[in-house]
Amino acid sequence: MKKVKLSLIANERSRKTSFMKRKNGIFKKLHELSTLCGVQACALIYSPFIPVPESWPSREGAKKVASKFLEMPRTARTRKMMDQETHLMERITKAKEQLKNLAAENRELQVRRFMFDCVEGKMSQYRYDAKDLQDLLSCMNLYLDQLNGRIESIKENGESLLSSVSPFPTRIGVDEIGDESFSDSPIHSTTRVVDTPNATNPHVLAGDMTPFLDADANANMNQVQYQAPNNLFNQIQREFYNINLNLNLNLNSNQYLNQQQSFMNPMVEQHMNHVGGRESIPFVDRNYYNYNQLPAVDLASTSYMPSTTDVYDPYINNNL
């Protein structure tokens, strides 16, 4: 809604229309006030647009309220009474008080900036007098008092604060990170070492032989540390060799007898490092377990092409 400019309406017809509308609005508000709040109120309006002064709620009601008001003491009547001059003087007083407060805030900011610039060696940039130096000294003393109070507080509570902090554990496993880590209670750390069994580890091992737990084992992994045995490579190669000896190639013995024999011999010989003394297939791209590496087969002596699905995986074929 557009704000109305408080000035005399130049057009007489518009002024009369506005008068009638606002007069009815005042009478409506007085009726709501007296009905909702249970107070006695009256209104008396003089206007050049009507020959007789108009009163609310009626002439008798207005006289009754006016008589009751005149019976009150003068101090009680004039306590909240205000004319135009009194209203303007009150507004001027409030504005002067606000100006005084803003001037004090600006002066404090100027002195604080002057102090920080003096610390940085920029004192020569200012033109100051004795009053400025006195204000600067007061500001510096205020900051020094705050610093000294802070130092005394740290000296008094320093030992108790340091003693309440629990020391860090010297050796921990996998830390459990959760909401409990931010509680006030001290943290108790335990480490549980689990030795890897002689059988093949069911968890997947990365290229650097660091074990990773699967999703099922993650449910209770609070500070568990796994240690692999020193002979893990020999155990894997031995398991690889034993399973390859019992591998069923599902070939027709009548049709592929020679091909099966020529395919099995190189595979067995390549992984008999601890039996036959031959070298294993060299590692390619950190492939420590010979994944997806075909055996060296003499294609000139056989017509059978080995399938890539027959390559042994120690963890996939463990459940066969």
Swiss-Prot record:
SMART domains: MADS. Keywords: Coiled coil, DNA-binding, Nucleus, Transcription, Transcription regulation. It is found in: Nucleus. Residues 1-59 form the MADS-box domain. Pfam families: SRF-TF. Residues 80-115 form a coiled coil. CDD domains: MADS_SRF_like (cd00266). The keyword Cell inner membrane does not apply. GO terms for biological process: positive regulation of transcription by RNA polymerase II. It comes from the Eukaryota. One of its GO terms (molecular function) is DNA-binding transcription factor activity. One of its GO terms (cellular component) is nucleus. Probable transcription factor. Interacts with AGL62. PANTHER family: AGAMOUS-LIKE-34-RELATED, MADS BOX PROTEIN. This is Agamous-like MADS-box protein AGL90. It comes from Arabidopsis thaliana. The gene is AGL90.
